[in-house]
Amino acid sequence: MQKARIKLSSTQHVELDGVCDQIKAIAEKTGVDMAGPIPLPTKALKVTTRKSTDGEGSSSFDRWTMRVHKRVIDIEADERTMKHIMKVRIPDTVQIEIELRN
């Protein structure tokens, strides 16, 4: 049977976990084997900008950080389960990638 690897990423971990819980509930309801959600390391993207735009005065900086949270779910890809997963409402802040493998 084919397997599906579902990769989820988001800057909002609460919404990401909500989508993972919905997929987990679908897998339990349809009775397919599932592994995950496996949390991958959080990537922290950092940007430092200078507060003063004219270059005069003391050097003071703003530090901005964006954290990207990732999860991986491996699931058996039967037709009924995949139809239910495709109908899950996914927030705009969550990116999803589904890869089918044999």
UniProtKB/Swiss-Prot annotation:
InterPro entries: Ribosomal_uS10 (IPR001848), Ribosomal_uS10_CS (IPR018268), Ribosomal_uS10_dom (IPR027486), Ribosomal_uS10_dom_sf (IPR036838), Ribosomal_uS10_euk/arc (IPR005729). GO terms for cellular component: small ribosomal subunit. Pfam families: Ribosomal_S10. Keywords: Ribonucleoprotein, Ribosomal protein. It comes from the Archaea. One of its GO terms (biological process) is translation. GO terms for molecular function: structural constituent of ribosome; tRNA binding. Coiled coil: none annotated. HAMAP family: Ribosomal_uS10 (MF_00508). Belongs to the universal ribosomal protein uS10 family. Part of the 30S ribosomal subunit. Involved in the binding of tRNA to the ribosomes. PANTHER family: 30S RIBOSOMAL PROTEIN S10 FAMILY MEMBER. This is Small ribosomal subunit protein uS10. The gene is rps10.
